[in-house]
């Protein structure tokens, strides 16, 4: 494996340097994406940029919302894996870096970390205005015009490295590599942030982190949830018997060590409560071994199937520290409350007693106590739906368009 990684890094570096000024045709792996420098492409009025499109998460849902807000805007990104992210991206024009030609790095984007400063710096975005969705890389792309940076978080692998890697991977190849190149990454990241005048945070927690890390005072635009109130639901094949009674708790998360999925499993095992986990990630095998007969773990489902899982659950468990955390809003669209960790973005989206209840620490003991105490009859479904409507995609699109209009007007006036 290490030899494959080393070969991929060497090969990718050569690709980036030798191909950065060339244009490639649409690739089969990332249809209709184009892998190349974009020097010959006519500059659009507006473009969208994002770190990489290789997974299904809240940041990727924000990019989908940006695509719906600006459907003609091309999306620039370092890596794109169609089968790994949301299928709706297949309808977008996606332009990738030369790094996308290395299959191993598309599948395991963390292996690309040492190459991403160079890759990002070489990825030209020739647009008059760019809306940049970033967790640490896209704000360093090579922009030719104005940019509005929508920040999900300053780079976690720099400023929250232990959380990003998890205890078991601190001394892994990637963990050691990050420590070695930390000064280079910090220099690159701080310089990229300094070149970006117009920042927006996605939550109060990120607003505070941007102030601490970059010294910027920025406004907030809350991200949207994927509305489920009017969506047609589709049962998940093979789970009808498990979910039919509507007596299960739901957890929707990437299966990473810092997400505390193991604590939720232990809590439900002890309490004898059903738990449906939707997500994928490197911790899956470990979590399967930990799970009792009351737990199911699934992944790769459609939005309609996700909607069905939300509608028929007792409540959502949201027990990791999230910078914003969209899942409580997705649950709320179906009138479902949340048992959440009192931290981070959940403080923006959960009003205690209305659409959720808090635990003080994400331990199995506190999760167990909360699910034993939980009574579904105490929650008003319609009140929950009314509350989370303020986080709708329509509201997000209106606020983003207004921010872009203000940026364009400011640029035109020379202010």
Summary of predicted features, one role per range:
Residues 318, 337-342, 350:
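Short hydrophobic beta-strand element within catalytic cores of glycosyltransferases
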Residues 299-300, 352-353, 357-364, 371-378:
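Conserved acidic donor-binding segment of nucleotide-sugar-dependent glycosyltransferases
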Residues 69-137:
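Active-site donor-binding segments of glycosyltransferases and PAPS-dependent sulfotransferases
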Residues 166-199, 207-208:
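Membrane-proximal helix-turn-helix segments that form the acceptor-binding/catalytic region
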Residues 225, 240-259, 265-276:
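Conserved donor-binding/catalytic core segment of Leloir-type glycosyltransferases
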């Amino acid at each position: 494996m290490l030899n494959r990684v080393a070969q991929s890094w060497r090969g990718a570096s050569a690709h980036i340097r030798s191909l950065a000024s060339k244009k490639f045709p649409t690739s089969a792996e990332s249809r209709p994406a184009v892998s190349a420098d974009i020097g010959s492409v006519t500059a659009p009025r507006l473009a969208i940029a994002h770190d990489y499109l290789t997974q299904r998460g809240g940041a990727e849902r924000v990019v989908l919302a940006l695509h719906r807000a600006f459907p003609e805007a091309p999306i620039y990104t370092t890596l794109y894996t169609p089968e790994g992210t949301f299928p709706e991206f297949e309808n977008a024009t996606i332009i990738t870096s030369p790094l996308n030609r290395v299959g191993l790095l598309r599948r395991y984007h963390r292996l690309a970390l040492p190459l991403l400063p160079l890759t990002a710096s070489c990825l030209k975005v020739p647009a008059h205005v760019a809306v940049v969705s970033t967790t640490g890389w896209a704000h360093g792309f090579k922009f030719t015009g104005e940019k509005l940076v929508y920040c999900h978080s300053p780079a976690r692998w720099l400023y929250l490295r232990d959380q990003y890697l998890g205890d078991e991977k601190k001394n892994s190849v990637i963990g050691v590599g990050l420590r070695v190149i930390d000064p280079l990454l910090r220099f690159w990241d701080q310089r990229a942030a300094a070149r970006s005048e117009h920042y927006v945070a996605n939550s109060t927690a990120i607003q505070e982190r941007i102030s601490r890390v970059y010294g910027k005072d920025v406004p907030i635009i809350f991200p949207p949830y994927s509305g489920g109130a009017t969506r047609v639901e589709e049962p998940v094949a093979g789970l009808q018997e498990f979910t039919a009674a509507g007596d299960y708790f739901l957890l929707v998360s990437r299966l990473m060590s810092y997400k505390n999925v193991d604590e939720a499993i232990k809590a439900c095992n002890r309490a004898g409560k059903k738990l449906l986990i939707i997500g994928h990630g490197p911790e899956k095998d470990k979590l399967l071994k930990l799970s009792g007969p009351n737990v199911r773990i699934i992944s790769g489902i459609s939005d309609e199937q996700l909607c069905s899982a939300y509608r028929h659950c007792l409540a959502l468990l949201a027990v990791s520290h999230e910078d914003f955390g969209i899942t409580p809003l997705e649950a709320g669209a179906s009138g479902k409350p949340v048992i959440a960790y009192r931290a981070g973005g959940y403080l923006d989206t959960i009003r205690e007693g209305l659409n959720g209840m808090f635990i003080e620490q994400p331990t199995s003991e506190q999760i167990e106590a909360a699910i034993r105490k939980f009574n579904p009859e105490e929650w008003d479904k319609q009140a929950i739906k009314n509350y989370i409507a303020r986080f709708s995609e329509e509201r997000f699109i209106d606020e983003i368009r207004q921010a872009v209009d203000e940026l364009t007007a400011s640029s035109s006036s020379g202010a």
